[in-house]
Every structure is written in structure tokens, then in C-alpha cells.
Amino acid sequence: MSKRSAKIAATYFLTIIISLVLIGGGGYLVINKYLNKTPDKSGIDDIVIDDGAAQDAEYAPVFGDGRTVLFIYEAEKSQTSTSFLLARFAPADNKAVLVPLQTDIACELDGTANTLYEFYRLGGTSSAKRAVEKFTGLTVDRYLKFTKDSFNTFADFMGNVEYNIPDNLIFQNPSTGESTVIKSGNQILDSNTLRKVMCYPDYSGGEEYRAKVVGNLAAELLNSGSRGILRDSLDSVFTDIINSDIETDITRYDYDEDKPAIEYVLSNTSEPAQLVIPSGSYNENGCYQLDDTFVDALPRWFAME
């Protein structure tokens, strides 16, 4: 190769090397600047995630949600030791409507006229449920029957309640030998004393007044639990109650289905209980007859229409 050709080749080769260095270095600078560019975070700190809105979106109650449940309490086999209460859980209104039903309510079922207690005594919970459906015109979805022990378990969970005892309550139970001696005035009632007040047979207002006492105590008990253990330990309460000697057709599936609605209500109010006292009069047979105005208003109170 001539000197001139070698010089040209060297010059050409050097030009290529310099070009590669310049281009590669520039490219590296451009790419490095892009890769290491600090993102613009302005405005991110101003974004607030509404956890409450996200939680509410998990369950949104609609009108008509809820169940109607008949509660029966039988401390022993006698009329004044038995209580009935119809409850409607209405999550759309954040409430549980409680209607105490006195044992001497008149009803005609299958051509037989009798009282609620007698239908229950003769036919058990299924007959009591049918009788309540007949004189209220409502469908009872489920029932819960408490014994003395299961009621004490439930009441212990819910907590003591304060109640104004109207009179001195003095009674010696001839069947059990148990004594009741409770002074009038404001009292803090535990589960055992609560039961005695509910089952006291000698109120001056008779069975009609005793039913009102049961309703007021039930409302106080529910609200007490809603401020405490129901809000904090709902699963534990259900498990322990359902595993007691309670009689019910409520299943675990029912509970799991209703749990979001219950939690929704408990998160929105600490006093969901709303008491509705029945109205009526005694008929010629000495049975309490619910008046039509009360019966017609029940669906509205129960948030069903």
C-alpha cells in the first residue's frame, strides 16, 4: 500500500472512532438524563383517599332490606314467665324496631280462637309464629327462643342496663322457690335481676304493662350491646349464643348474609333500637285485641313500604 493510501485509511479510521465516541457519549447523556429524571410529584400530597367512602361502598342498604324475627323468652312454663317480642331489622333506616307482644293477644288460627300464649303452649314455636303472622299480617322470617340460661348468656354479653322500677317488686315463685325483692326507682340490672323484672307477675297494669316493661328492657339491652360488645365482637357473640341452649332456625349462612348490614348499622348509630308499643283493647272474652290502626301501620314502622 502506498503512503498516500495508508494516510487516507488512517484518517478515515480515526474519523469513525471520534464519531462513535461523540455520538455514544451524547446518547449516553441523553438516555441517562431521561432515566434519572426526577418525577414531578407536585399535587400528590393534596390527594386524600376517603377510607370511609370506600368502606361504605362495600355495603349500601336499600329500602326493604332486613329480616323480621320473633323472639320468645320462656324462663319457665307459665304465662307470666314467657315473653314475646317481634323485631324488624331495617338497615336502610339504621334501626331495629322492637314490638313487645303481650301473651294474651287474641288470635284465630285454623278455626280456633285463642291467645298467643295458648297457641304457643299447645303448639310450640311454630304455632306461635303462625299466630303472630295471622294477627299482624306480616311474614316472620326467623325465630329465636331463649331459655333462662341462654337469656342470661345473651344479657351478660350485652351488659347491665339502667331502668326505673315503677314499684317495689316482691314475689315468691311457688314453682321454683325463687324470691324477688327489688326496690322501686332507678336500678342497675344484671342478667338475673333483669329476668326477674321481666317475669314479675303482679304489675298493677297487668299483662299489658308487663309487655311494655319487656319492650323497654329489650330496647335498653340492645342499645347497651350496640355501644359495646356487638360493635367490637359480633362474631363471638353470635357463636356463643348459637352454641347455647337457644332454639332457633337462624343459620350461620343467615348470619354471614346479614353481617355486613349489621356492621353498617352499628357503625352509624349506637342506639338502633326503636320501641313501638301496640295499641288495642280487651274484648268480651278478656283477650287483648290489636286495633286495625296499629296493624295497618306496622309495615310502615318496619320500613317495608
Predicted regions and their residues:
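Second-shell loop/turn segments in exported
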Residues: A75, N114-L122, F135-R142, C199-Y209, ...
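C-terminal solvent-exposed extensions
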Residues: D51-A57, T68-Y73, K77-S78, D93, ...
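Extracytoplasmic
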Residues: G64-G66, Q79-F84, D93-L101, S127, ...
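Amphipathic, coiled-coil-like alpha-helical scaffolding segments used for oligomerization/assembly
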Residues: L122-V181
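Flexible, solvent-exposed short loops/turns enriched in glycine
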Residues: V97-G123, D167-T180
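Flexible, polar/acidic helix-loop-strand segments at domain edges
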Residues: D156-S236
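Entry/capping segment at the start of metal-dependent catalytic domains
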Residues: S2-N94, C199, I262
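Extracytoplasmic/secreted envelope proteins and their assembly/folding machinery
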Residues: S83-F84, T125-E133, K148-N152, D156, ...
